[in-house]
């Protein structure tokens, strides 16, 4: 078995409007039954994820907060991979009128319409923070922390090579971890720039696309091993 791990994004990949349908859940269970590991790699805060997805136990590990937090569903253990946001930064954002501000243990997120206010606060306070885009959202994390950070930590805990993972995503913030996987997939509703930088694009959107690729994987890994097109952003060996 070459591909022993499936690493998937949540919103826009597994989930449509925040929910995962029954067919997708059943396919994930089939993948687990095949002896493979499941990783969820999401920008969501853990509590937000729990509210919409009670089946966290399907996954061996969950990378939350866009790579800043690693969670073990079986034990409830959480491991922070980044520092919490400075209170001065949060205060400045609130004073600037950045509405819909979401603050996790490490991540800060708001609407993309407030991107300028976020940049201004980072610069004026001289903070070592970065902005990560995710469709209509802006996420703020320490420099060097993204989905690849949590993905690497999760694979290390599983003691499996990164090249043994099939990664599935849909948006800008998924580049970081898909770029490391042995095989990368964009679902049909993914942004165009992501579709140009992966090994496979599904015909189906979100959950239907995930089901499509996992069915192929369970039937045979041969098509995955052979599909190595020219990529605009070459993957690491």
Ranges and model annotations:
Residues 17-103:
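Active-site phosphate-binding/coordination module
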Residues 2-18, 178:
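Asp-based phosphoryl-transfer active-site loop
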Residues 4-6, 60, 165:
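The start of beta-strands in P-loop NTPase/AAA+ ATPase cores
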Residues 6, 31, 62, 184-186, ...:
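Short, well-ordered beta-strand core segments
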Residues 180, 185-237:
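Asp-based, Mg2+/Mn2+-dependent phosphohydrolase catalytic module
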Residues 87-181, 185, 189-197, 223:
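Conserved acidic, metal-coordinating active-site core of Asp-based
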Residues 56-59, 79-82, 148-149, 202-205, ...:
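Short, hinge-like loop/turn segments at secondary-structure boundaries
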């Amino acid at each position: 078995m070459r591909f022993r791990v499936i690493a998937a994004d949540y919103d826009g990949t597994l989930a449509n409007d925040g929910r995962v349908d029954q067919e997708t859940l059943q396919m994930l269970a089939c993948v687990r039954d095949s002896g493979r590991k499941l990783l969820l790699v999401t920008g969501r805060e853990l509590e937000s994820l729990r509210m919409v997805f009670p089946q966290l136990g399907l996954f061996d590990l969950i990378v939350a907060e866009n790579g800043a937090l690693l969670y073990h569903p079986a034990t409830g253990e959480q491991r922070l991979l980044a520092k919490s946001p400075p209170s001065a930064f949060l205060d400045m954002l609130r004073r600037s009128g950045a509405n819909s501000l979401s603050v996790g243990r490490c991540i800060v997120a708001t609407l993309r319409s407030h991107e300028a206010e976020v940049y201004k606060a980072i610069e004026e306070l001289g903070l070592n923070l970065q902005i990560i885009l995710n469709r209509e959202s802006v996420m703020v994390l320490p420099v060097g922390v993204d989905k690849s950070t949590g993905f690497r930590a999760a694979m290390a805990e599983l003691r499996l090579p990164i090249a043994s993972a099939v990664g599935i995503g849909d948006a800008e913030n998924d580049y970081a971890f898909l770029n490391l996987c042995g095989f990368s997939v964009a679902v049909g509703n993914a942004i165009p720039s992501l579709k140009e930088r992966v090994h496979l694009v599904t015909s189906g959107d979100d959950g239907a696309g995930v089901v499509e690729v996992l069915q192929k994987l369970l039937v045979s890994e041969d098509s995955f091993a052979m599909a190595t097109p020219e990529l605009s952003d070459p993957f690491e060996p």
